Amino acid sequence: GKSDTLVNPVVLTYREAGKRLSPDGSLWGWLPLNGFHNETRFNRLGELEPTPALSDDRTSWPSFWPDRLDNPDDPGWSNEWNGFFGRGVFNADLEGFYVIDDYSDLEYSVDPETQQPLSQWGVFYPSPSDSTIGGLALQTKVRIFQWANILAEDTAFILYRITNTGEKDYRYNSSGDEGVFFGQIMDYGLGNEEGDENAAFDALQDVTYGWDQDGIGQHPDGTLYDLGYTGFAFL
C-alpha cells in the first residue's frame, strides 16, 4: 500500500512555546547567518544592541555583504546599502534585510555519544554527504519593506527567498505525498496585554486577521488606547 506521509517540521522557534534544544543546550531551528549585520552595534545609550540590517541605520550594516563578494566592480558593497532594488538604492522608506538557515536543526540526526537517533521519528539528513547540516538545508533571504505613502503606510511587505542548498529534492509530485509547503506562525499579542486576542480567516479575501476582544490596548505606563485589526496574507 501507499506509505505514510513523512512530515518533517522545519522549525517552531518561538520563544518557550516552540523552542527545541539539543542535549547540550544548542538551539534547533532557524538561526541568522553571520556577516549580514553589525554584531558590535551600540545603541544611543552606549549599550551593545545588534539588530537586523536596516536601511536607515548605517550602524546596523556589516563592513561588507557576503552575498555581494562576487560583484566585479565593488566586491562586498562596502559602506553601501544592500538593497533589493540595487546597490545603495533606497526605494522603500524603510527596508530590513537578514539571512537565516535551518542547518542547526539537528533533532533528526544521530547522537554522536550514544549513536542512537535523537528523535523517535527517525533520522533525516538533507545532505547525506554532510551530517553536520540539519533541518531541510534551507537558506532564506528575508527582506521587509515599508512605505510612508498613505496607501501603504500601515502595511509591511515581507519577501522570502528560500533556497534548497541540500542534496534532497523536495519537489511536489502528482501523488501528493511529497513537497514543501510554506506557512507562518503569527502571535497576535495586540495592545501590550494578552489573554483576550482572537483570530479568524476570511476565505473570500484570503486573509488571516486578528483583533483584541475589547478593542482596548494598554501602554506600559497604564494608559489605555483604542486598537484596530491586524491582517496577514500571502501574495
Which residues fall in each region the model found?
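A long-range scaffold signal marking pre-active-site subdomains of enzyme folds
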Residues: 1-235
